Amino acid sequence: MSDNRALRRAHVLANHILQSNPPSSNPSLSRELCLQYSPPELNESYGFDVKEMRKLLDGHNVVDRDWIYGLMMQSNLFNRKERGGKIFVSPDYNQTMEQQREITMKRIWYLLENGVFKGWLTETGPEAELRKLALLEVCGIYDHSVSIKVGVHFFLWGNAVKFFGTKRHHEKWLKNTEDYVVKGCFAMTELGHGSNVRGIETVTTYDPKTEEFVINTPCESAQKYWIGGAANHATHTIVFSQLHINGTNQGVHAFIAQIRDQDGSICPNIRIADCGHKIGLNGVDNGRIWFDNLRIPRENLLNAVADVSSDGKYVSSIKDPDQRFGAFMAPLTSGRVTIASSAIYSAKVGLSIAIRYSLSRRAFSVTANGPEVLLLDYPSHQRRLLPLLAKTYAMSFAANELKMIYVKRTPETNKAIHVVSSGFKAVLTWHNMHTLQECREAVGGQGVKTENLVGQLKGEFDVQTTFEGDNNVLMQQVSKALFAEYVSCKKRNKPFKGLGLEHMNSPRPVLPTQLTSSTLRCSQFQTNVFCLRERDLLEQFTSEVAQLQGRGESREFSFLLSHQLAEDLGKAFTEKAILQTILDAEAKLPTGSVKDVLGLVRSMYALISLEEDPSLLRYGYLSQDNVGDVRREVSKLCGELRPHALALVTSFGIPDSFLSPIAFNWVEANAWSSV
């Protein structure tokens, strides 16, 4: 190196070392050259009344929802923090598992002290149930761990006591459960059995000498597993067990067992272990339970369906074991109802964040020296998010309808509720997971950051696809129910009534070969194609099962061999039911901007559902040209929904504090001053 070059290098290094001002303070660098955050509200107008749309979407108890939002925002228990000039409340997912569990319980105590759970088990009627569902949904928007822990206590333990039990159980347990004097959990799932509840291996016998039941875990696969609340906090559990009376297995029954005393010590003849760290929901203390000759009073059998007398005689008004098991399972529908609705609120959080971010974040320019383009002005970005937004809208109406038929249920509607809740739970939770993944990718690297929520929510909600029924199993249950209804009506030569199959009493709809834009957006065309798909798949499914049975296969094995048709049919039934709920909501609206926008949303839901379903081509409902027409119309609808994007997510009614920093001033939230 020459002397001159060495001197120059030394001079540069000296300037670096001695420089006292950061580069940004250099007056020659204009601040205007830096990116500035511009709130979407400055450039995006609302083309309809967002408050009216919110009332439609939430469906019920808007005032109660806003009340509990306020309760959470005013307490430091909910991890208030300032980012980018705004206050946010969201869990600290960086805490240890033990810390997350304890703060979750403290948050529940806070909600209890402020009257949130008043009447949840002791008040009856549709209004009381809808209020409870609304408050639980807001808990889930804040933190899925809070809603799951509350849900296990009230909807699983509490509802089991309420619906499986009788007056003696109600008087002893319901008020104490509502006040958290008793903390309940629900021991159904075992290491070896989940969806197949009838196969569980826990065994209960009766001792007439002491008038006690004796519960045992006979093998390791019979240990109760994933029992929310069992690892730390629960004092009591509902035990699902095979009931053996005088050497005869009477099937699965439910019992109340104490597992901890009021000091938190584990009771004798009980062993409990922790399930450990999970991919999400670490605020819920999932545990494993073994029973070693645990004795409980005879009165602890939940006896609404069956009972055992003091001298050991088994008594039930329902003689058929299958019907008796069905009666036990019917009250558990509430779990699928709450899961379906909470999945949609999770999707709303993800879309609110991703769409708001895409309305302020820019990337690349399309003209030389031109301004960078907003992410949501790229057709590809619209294609990623706006169809999911439309689906979320349609599924909001579906979830509301499911809640309404659930709270107004009668013995005559139990079958329909089981079928609809199974389909909705599967399709809505799958939709949520797909939506969160797309939102995570749509916000780029910011989606990996925990405080921005969209990435974290994937782990928090992933479990929904398998608990309260594996989604694929639920789809097959839907198809089996439709099969049974179809065969029954044909055998009796009766018209179809119930399960939404009434359209099959009319002639088969004929679809036009040429699909124009107006045809594709016509509600009658959309209804026809959804009905045709369901009708044809049901006929194909029953025909295939019948052919297999004709070759000597059992009905159950025939169902297994026809699984592809069964899953296609389950999806077709559910998507048609969802379409009907948004059509019903739209029909009730007066002419105006809300109705117009909802019409666009409905068409987007219908057409994107058709575009994404390979069965339309597989079974020949649409030609390749038709599929191209649908695809082009979806792209047109993306452009028409784009101006409404901000208003559509604002209509979700989720307070800013429950979203994340990248939904707002992401520049200020990441500034050096915030470090």
From Swiss-Prot:
UniProt pH dependence: Optimum pH is 8.5-9.0.
Oxidoreductase found in the keyword field: yes
Protein's job: Catalyzes the desaturation of medium-chain acyl-CoAs to 2-trans-enoyl-CoAs. Active on C8:0- to C14:0-CoA with a maximal activity on C12:0-CoA.
Protein name as annotated: Acyl-coenzyme A oxidase 3, peroxisomal
Induction: Not induced by dehydration or abscisic acid (ABA).
GO BP terms in the entry: fatty acid beta-oxidation; fatty acid beta-oxidation using acyl-CoA oxidase; medium-chain fatty acid metabolic process
Pathways involved: Lipid metabolism; peroxisomal fatty acid beta-oxidation
Catalysis: reaction(s): a 2,3-saturated acyl-CoA + O2 = a (2E)-enoyl-CoA + H2O2
Enzyme kind, highest EC tier: oxidoreductase
GO cellular component terms attached to this protein's record: extracellular region; peroxisome
Family per record: Belongs to the acyl-CoA oxidase family.
PANTHER family membership: ACYL-COENZYME A OXIDASE-LIKE PROTEIN, ELECTRON TRANSPORT OXIDOREDUCTASE
UniProt keyword Flavoprotein present: yes
Stretches that traverse the bilayer: none
Single GO term (MF): acyl-CoA oxidase activity
Location(s) in or outside the cell: Peroxisome
Primary gene name: ACX3
Entry EC no(s): 1.3.3.6
Binding site for FAD: 442-457
Tissue expression profile of the protein: Most abundant in flowers and senescing rosette leaves. Lower expression in hypocotyls, stems, young rosette leaves, cotyledons, cauline leaves and root tip of young seedlings.
